[in-house]
Swiss-Prot record:
Keywords: Antiviral defense. The keyword Plastid does not apply. This is CRISPR-associated protein Cas5. Induction: Repressed by 5 J/m2 ultraviolet light and 50 mM NaCl, slightly induced by 20 J/m2 ultraviolet light, 100 and 150 mM Nacl. Member of the csa5-cas7-cas5a-cas3-cas3'-cas8a2 operon. CRISPR (clustered regularly interspaced short palindromic repeat) is an adaptive immune system that provides protection against mobile genetic elements (viruses, transposable elements and conjugative plasmids). CRISPR clusters contain spacers, sequences complementary to antecedent mobile elements, and target invading nucleic acids. CRISPR clusters are transcribed and processed into CRISPR RNA (crRNA). Belongs to the CRISPR-associated protein Cas5 family. Subtype I-A/Apern subfamily. Can form a Cascade complex with Csa5, Cas7, Cas3, Cas3' and Cas8a2. The gene is cas5a. One of its GO terms (biological process) is maintenance of CRISPR repeat elements. The keyword tRNA processing does not apply.
């Protein structure tokens, strides 16, 4: 296995909670599948594959792609205006009246955080220059820049886990449950190691019933299936 701790920065990001529509609630941290999608897009930019094949290759390559809670973050709503029918009809509205009728709005939550850190575990080594091409974590406004990639062998440590884990793995701790898409796009119940206090999400922790490993600031369970 190959282990990476990725640090990304962004003005804001939004990964929509599954099963919501008009008010698009956002996860406080990116989902595993969003990270896999970002890696697949990076592989395409690097010329390693093309189109949907990149997503399939990324899904087969990644063992775990889990966000790590390392600091405070805040969510806030924003109103997004969209022009409907442009892609479907392959044309712009003919006039002002048509344009007004084609406009629609929705409320979407966004997240502000100083940095986003992600633990990535892969079956084969991924060149760091490919990881640094990861450019989006979420919707079309969720652009990020990868500023650091720590590659190394994790060491045995202890304490509470600070990455998202499957809820069945959690014994106790301070965390929030979310149903989200895992690395293969399947719906799973995850324990996110964050808790909301006064409108701000703060770092929590999850106690698991196995040995714990550390890579940089990421603390995660040993083995797989978590």
């Amino acid at each position: 296995m190959h282990y990476y701790l990725i640090e990304a920065r962004a003005p804001l990001y939004s990964v929509k909670v599954v099963d919501v529509y008009q008010v698009a609630s956002a996860y406080p941290l990116p989902t595993p599948h969003a990270v896999v999608g970002a890696l697949g897009a990076a592989m395409a930019h690097a010329g390693m594959c093309r189109g949907l094949q990149c997503m399939k290759e990324a899904e087969g390559l990644v063992v775990a792609a889990r966000p790590a809670a390392v600091g405070e973050l805040a969510k806030f709503p924003a109103v997004l205006w969209r022009t409907r029918g442009v892609l479907e009809d392959k044309s712009l509205p003919a006039g002002l009246e048509d344009y007004a009728g084609a406009r629609d709005a929705m409320v979407r939550e966004y997240v502000y955080a100083h940095a986003v850190k992600i633990l990535l575990v892969t079956r084969k080594r991924v060149p760091q220059h490919v990881i640094r091409l990861m450019a989006r974590l979420g919707d079309s406004e969720s652009y990020v820049s990868v500023v650091d990639v720590l590659e190394g062998k994790p060491r045995e440590c202890g304490g509470l886990v600070n990455v998202a884990v499957r809820a069945a793995k959690a014994r106790r701790g301070s965390y929030t449950l979310y149903r989200a898409l895992d690395e293969r796009g399947n719906r799973e119940l995850f324990a996110y190691p964050v808790v909301e206090e006064g409108g701000v999400y703060r770092r929590g922790g999850v106690e698991v019933g196995s040995k714990v490993l550390c890579l940089g600031e990421a603390v995660f369970p040993e083995g797989d299936g978590w």
